[in-house]
């Protein structure tokens, strides 16, 4: 029965009949191969040296996690120790034969399981020389997987915390060793925040086509984990980071009554005209240099104005005579006659272009008005008041007769009923002398009730034409004014007669 029971066990699980020394050597090689596979498939750290230059080679640095859960590591180490105690390695193992892991990214303190102080308990299977390989592998493999997963979880948590503190954008990417920050900026038209803090219109992709990590069959957990993380990162990369919205100016609400009043009352103080009158004016310093500058400027301006006026006078003179000299002589003789008829013996005049231009304009206007009325070169004497009114003058009949006598002193045309154009125009210049004659106001026409003159302008033209500015006077006020003036005149005549007697 014992032989029959032993046969199916051998069929199910093959046993290895070896000596004690061969078994230890085989277990040693198996464990070493297992750790070598794990170390080959491990991913190197993802920390990027952003200050590394292009010519520098990437350095493999160790990453020390911030915090490690001691309880979890203690349980894993204890399980590993228990599994190795079951295998019961010999006491003769020296320090040179210890299994040492290559330096990793994480400074993880491994237990010294092969120390000489630890004593292994003997097992019956070793004394018998029969050990099952499948049991050894089933014991070792889950314990090593648990240890690796615990290390990887601690590594990922600590690395993500550090990256969140160092970088303003989520770069929890598993980059290959040797990649720089310049390789991230490859594709245009996408915005993200790089390590310097400002927005760039470029995107980044992981250059993992040629540098993909080769995972072995034993590290399938890492392969699944990395495939999931790469997919999530690619999805996040396709979504461009939206820039922060610009701060818009605040829209003011409806103004209150106080705001309206404040806007109306812009300044509290006196009126601007009163302020200008009473304010202190700054004294303007007049220096000889400033006087010379002003004099030169005025000379330039006045010279330009006089030259322009001379050009106008020369063009207008062609309408009154053959040349400029003949027109000036004509103007001088007319001024001499006007002053002589007014009783002024100093008939010398100084030529002024402005006065000459004024006389030429008036003479041209009178000639046009005379041409409208004449059927031949002469008009009748009784048509003179109408001719004068067309020219804008309203003298009385007595003034017209007196001027007729002054103009026709020779006696030949004095009793004629026809008048030429030249004599009619000269009568107007005698009644209303030009500016060049310089006749005093005492010899000019006086203002009367029927022919008022205000500031040298006849008011009768407004009465005749019916100007809207004129108002109908109150007859009582006018009667009182006329009666007072008549009474004063009679009283003056009475006092004069009393003095003579």
Curated annotation (Swiss-Prot):
According to the entry, every stretch annotated as the IQ domain falls at 290-319
The chain's disulfide connectivity reads none
State the residue spans of region: Disordered. Answer: 237-262
What PROSITE patterns has UniProt attached to this entry?
A: IQ
Gene of origin? IQCM
Where do Basic and acidic residues bias regions lie?
237-247
InterPro entries in the record, alphabetically?
Answer: IQ_motif_EF-hand-BS (IPR000048)
Its protein name is IQ domain-containing protein M
